[in-house]
Structure formats: structure tokens, C-alpha cells
Amino acid sequence: MIEAQVGKRYAEAIYGIAEANNKVKELYDSLNIVMELYKGDKEFKNLVDHPLVKKEEKKEFINKVFSEFEKFSLDILCYLVEKNRLSYIRGVVAEYLKIYYTKNRIVDVEATFAIEPSEKQKAKLIEKLEKKTGKKVNLVIKINKAIIAGGIIKIGDEIIDGSVRRQLDTVARG
């Protein structure tokens, strides 16, 4: 709960700064790299979270580890360190992405099929979904042989289940 609140507040603030500096995508990419490292590297997480490690040492470490980042991204990361908020990186990135998607009219769509669709089928599906939603579609394909055939499309909270498994279950229930 706190991570989401902190994440939202900081994401809104840094998104505004990034937008004013025309660095929205660059900052998202940088934050995402830091988040993945935070999730996957226990030593990095421990260093960032450890209360006895001074902020200046953390900033120095950030600048060294992420030296390939542009100065703008490094400044934002150091700001998060200064405010003791780098440990909330997951919430910040999640909220930042929500803002980015909303402002750029992008929607995540999860499509589950029994077999992998061809590139042509994926392109056609994206085209139809973009027409239906009026937004750019970020399509994630999942494979689940249990649905037998057909597909299940999830757009936000809406689920369109056109799987043979659901149809068989409906017939069986009678």
C-alpha cells in the first residue's frame, strides 16, 4: 500500500520533470534497468536498503554502476536516493508506466492461445485490437495448450474468452 502511494507521488513528479526535459522514454528505460537490478541482485538491494550506508556512498555507487546512463537519469536516481525512495523503485516504475501509457494512449493486451500465432496473425490481431480500443496495443502472447483452440484476450479488466475449453465447459454444464 505504502509502496503504491509513494510510487505514484514520485512517478508523477519525475514524469513531469522528464516531460519538461523531453526525456520521458529515456528515464523510463533507466528506471526499468534499475528496477530489474533491484529485483534480481540481492547485493544491490541490500546496499540500497541498508540504513548504515551513507547517502553519498549510495549516490557514488549509483553513478559508478549506471555510468552509461545520461546525466538526467542519474540525477533522478540520486534524487530518489537522497529522499530514501530508491527502495520503492518498483512502485515508481509501475506508476510511471501507467502515466506513460495513459498520456500516449497505449494499452496492455494479454492474448492466450493453444499454439503460437504467426507474425501475420499477431499483426492482424494488433490491428483489430487497436481499432476496437482506439489505442496503441502492447501485445503479450501466452501459450496454454489447455484451452485446446481459439483464444482468450485480456484488455485491462475485460476478458474475451473464445476458447474451445470454455465452450466445452459451457456445454457440459448444460
From Swiss-Prot:
It is a peripheral membrane protein. F(1)F(0) ATP synthase produces ATP from ADP in the presence of a proton or sodium gradient. F-type ATPases consist of two structural domains, F(1) containing the extramembraneous catalytic core and F(0) containing the membrane proton channel, linked together by a central stalk and a peripheral stalk. During catalysis, ATP synthesis in the catalytic domain of F(1) is coupled via a rotary mechanism of the central stalk subunits to proton translocation. This protein is part of the stalk that links CF(0) to CF(1). It either transmits conformational changes from CF(0) to CF(1) or is implicated in proton conduction. The ATPase of I.tartaricus is of special interest because it uses sodium ions instead of protons as the physiological coupling ion. One of its GO terms (molecular function) is proton-transporting ATP synthase activity, rotational mechanism. It comes from Ilyobacter tartaricus. Pfam families: OSCP (PF00213). This is ATP synthase subunit delta, sodium ion specific. F-type ATPases have 2 components, F(1) - the catalytic core - and F(0) - the membrane proton channel. F(1) has five subunits: alpha(3), beta(3), gamma(1), delta(1), epsilon(1). F(0) has three main subunits: a(1), b(2) and c(10-14). The alpha and beta chains form an alternating ring which encloses part of the gamma chain. F(1) is attached to F(0) by a central stalk formed by the gamma and epsilon chains, while a peripheral stalk is formed by the delta and b chains. Belongs to the ATPase delta chain family. Its main location: membrane. GO terms for cellular component: plasma membrane; proton-transporting ATP synthase complex. The keyword Nuclease does not apply. Signal peptide: none annotated.
